[in-house]
From Swiss-Prot:
Purpose: May be involved in transcriptional regulation.
Polar residues compositional bias, start-end: 1-13, 22-38, 63-73
Higher taxonomy: Eukaryota, Metazoa, Chordata, Craniata, Vertebrata
Entry protein name: Zinc finger protein 391
Family: Belongs to the krueppel C2H2-type zinc-finger protein family.
Record bears the keyword Metal-binding: yes
Any one cellular-component term (Gene Ontology): nucleus
Keyword terms, alphabetized: DNA-binding, Metal-binding, Nucleus, Repeat, Transcription, Transcription regulation, Zinc, Zinc-finger
């Protein structure tokens, strides 16, 4: 049995060593990884042996299973006498079983609530917290709780300001690896989420969901103050700040405050002059991704914003709003000098020049 416990650091390294020494490294390796034909033979035999030791199932070899045809009779392992190795290598074997599931895609751990399956019991335990509402991981700064320790770690970075994930292209840093992955699609142009209705593609699944509501006209998020409905949750949160007057995001350069962090980020580019969004057709650059999207419609001819009254299409939502005033008669822009009203702010500005000339 001592020969089976050979030193892993100085154990045999080739077939000749095995023949001469009759030893076997105790390191458990995965058969799915590439190896020489000799290594594959040894690992396959080790896997069968471990299966017999831990499950009692007999492998394809004889009941008295030898690790190598060159091992003498004293080095053979009789069935039922594997307990010392079992105790010694139980952790190695469990790690091997877990690792092999990556290749087999076997998911034996099934949720009783929703039938979702997992490779490991630990993953099932974490998943079950969705149904039970359990959030055992609490932030010691603000008291917010989470169902996963990884979510707590990510949250704590909002307090520490730590951003360990950096973009290799532009150097921008993020607190979450998922945010970095999403950001990198700006550089690669990858848009894996495609609309089944019109074929338009998006870099984020949330953007696809929001877009699909332009086809369904679904607006599930309703404001309790004014009854206005929205297609996505983030927009209603931003809208509600109109009622509360909350502007939590302040510019460190000029002190101007904003209700939305993306608005602050876009505003800060007026100080830095940064224009990170470039049109692939003509090379024109923009400080906002939305401005680039609207500009690209000049090249594509896309007009996704359609008037429900007359069916006329527009490339910008703001252009549709202005157009709709021709149907409603609304003229929200009024001249302070003569009281004349206009449906567009630009028309009011042109009109006011008449008074200044006078």
């Amino acid at each position: 049995m001592e020969s089976l416990r050979g030193n892993t650091a100085q154990g045999p390294t080739n077939e000749e060593d095995y023949k001469n020494e009759g030893q076997l490294s105790r390191q458990t390796k995965c058969p799915a990884q590439k190896k020489s034909s000799f290594e594959n033979t040894v690992v396959r035999k080790v896997s069968v042996t471990l299966k017999e030791i831990f499950t009692g199932e007999e492998g394809p070899e004889s009941s008295e299973f030898s690790l190598s045809p060159n091992l003498d009779a004293q080095q053979k392992i009789p069935k039922g006498h594997g307990s010392p190795i079992s105790r010694k290598n139980s952790k190695d074997n469990s790690d091997l079983i877990k690792h092999q599931r990556l290749f087999s895609q076997r998911k034996p751990c099934k949720c009783n609530e929703c039938e979702k399956a997992f490779s490991y019991q630990s993953d099932l335990l974490v998943h079950s917290r969705i149904h039970g509402g359990e959030k055992p991981f609490e932030c010691n700064k603000c008291g917010k709780s989470f169902s996963r320790s990884t979510h707590l770690i990510e949250h704590q970075r909002t307090h520490t300001g730590e951003k360990p994930y950096e973009c290799n292209e532009c150097g921008k840093a993020f607190s979450r690896s998922t945010h970095l992955s999403l950001h990198q699609r700006i550089h690669t142009g990858e848009k894996p989420y495609e609309c089944s209705e019109c074929g338009k593609a998006f870099s984020r699944s949330t953007n696809l969901s929001q877009h699909q509501r332009t086809h369904t006209q679904e607006r599930p998020y309703k404001c309790n103050e004014c009854g206005k409905a929205f297609g996505d949750r983030s927009t209603i949160i931003q809208h509600q700040r109109i009622h509360t007057g909350e502007n939590p995001y302040e510019c460190s350069k000029c002190g101007k405050a904003f209700s939305w962090i993306s608005s602050l980020t876009e505003h800060q580019r007026t100080h830095t002059g940064e224009n990170p969004y470039e049109c692939s057709e003509c090379g024109k650059v923009f400080s906002r991704s939305s401005s680039l999207t609207e500009h690209q419609r000049i090249h594509s001819g896309e007009k996704p914003h359609e008037c429900r009254v007359c069916g006329k299409g527009f490339s910008r939502s703001s252009s549709l709003i202005i157009h709709q005033r021709t149907h409603t008669g609304e003229k929200p822009y009024k001249c302070n000098d003569c009281g004349k009203a206009f449906c567009q702010s630009s028309t009011l500005i042109r009109h006011q020049h008449l008074h200044t000339k006078e």
